[in-house]
């Protein structure tokens, strides 16, 4: 299949939503409840507040290609450095093959920067993330070389407690001899359950430059123990042979405010 270029991916969400950058007083504040990039694949369309540090962590068990694996801690560290702007880093996660033909090893460390460009904060939110997986992990797990990516998570609050969310990501693998580009699209239907809990169902599609796509249905939920702490879970089921047969995970996230 044909993939849109970087310029098209950058411009399309902005044109559709009529985006102009959010002003500082419309950005997330320390009194805002925690908004995480987990447990769904789709990341939050909001950044962490300026002066706040957020840590998101989780473990998964999965089955694919006839083998079982465990991975953790899937840690993402996020720091609000300016209004509507954060820096983040995905720390190396260890993937342990339990049985079957799967490989074991660490994933890459992946720094990034995220900018919130909400055209209508609280109703329509959009962010742009630019990052790269640095070649620190096991090649059998993550593939060869540096892997830059661009990403656009968005959300739209509907009537009542419902919202729809989604994300488009382009992963570039310049020195991969076969697949130099993978595009991932997600779509989420989410519902708030009271003031502190939420549930979701999510579609995830990975489309490679060469080879067949992978389709996954993911569902789960989370609970805010406090306004700055969250526990969560998810269960994903693959829809074709290119996706994991299943993946189940749990997680815990927290945020510290007013650091500067």
Model-predicted regions and their roles:
Residues 24-260:
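Transmembrane beta-barrel domains of Gram-negative outer membranes and organellar outer membranes
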Residues 1-5:
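N-terminal secretory signal peptides that target proteins for export/translocation
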Residues 7-18:
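Bacterial N-terminal signal peptides
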Residues 19-23:
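C-terminal region of N-terminal signal peptides and the immediate post-cleavage residues
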